[in-house]
Amino acid sequence: MAGGQRLKRMADSVQRELSELIRQELKDPRLGGLVTISGVKVSPDLGYADVYVTVMGRELSDDQNEVAHRETLDILNKASGFLRQELSRRIKTRITPRLRFHYDKTNAYGNYMFGLIEKAVQDLPKRESDDEE
């Protein structure tokens, strides 16, 4: 299980350093909102790192939101070479994984489920205090 611990440490390091790099070094004005890295999965050979991101701070309709997320992923994937180079300077390993960015839908799914639960609770018949009689 030592390999699993090594991959977890590497993923944690990549997540921490990439968060800082995106916040401080990436100066693209199209990156509206706060880009948050929600998770990183590193391949066993350290060749690739799948980086899952969410974008906060944009109040858009669902269609605009989809386009904004795609645009953010395009920007990050185009900057992946620069980010990988900077990452290799910060993380002292023999191999620096190639970065692949993906949109993390767990937040959106959680909001969707919360909305369904709220609607179900509102649709429940109101309890009357007839039980006390």
Curated annotation (Swiss-Prot):
It is found in: Cytoplasm. The keyword Cytoplasm applies. It comes from the Bacteria. Its main location: cytoplasm. Keywords: Cytoplasm, Ribosome biogenesis. SUPFAM superfamilies: Ribosome-binding factor A, RbfA. One of its GO terms (biological process) is maturation of SSU-rRNA. GO terms for cellular component: cytosol. GO terms for molecular function: ribosomal small subunit binding. InterPro entries: KH_dom-like_a/b, RbfA, RbfA_dom_sf. Monomer. Binds 30S ribosomal subunits, but not 50S ribosomal subunits or 70S ribosomes. Belongs to the RbfA family. PANTHER family: RIBOSOME-BINDING FACTOR A, CHLOROPLASTIC-RELATED. One of several proteins that assist in the late maturation steps of the functional core of the 30S ribosomal subunit. Associates with free 30S ribosomal subunits (but not with 30S subunits that are part of 70S ribosomes or polysomes). Required for efficient processing of 16S rRNA. May interact with the 5'-terminal helix region of 16S rRNA. This is Ribosome-binding factor A. It comes from Acinetobacter baumannii (strain ATCC 17978 / DSM 105126 / CIP 53.77 / LMG 1025 / NCDC KC755 / 5377).
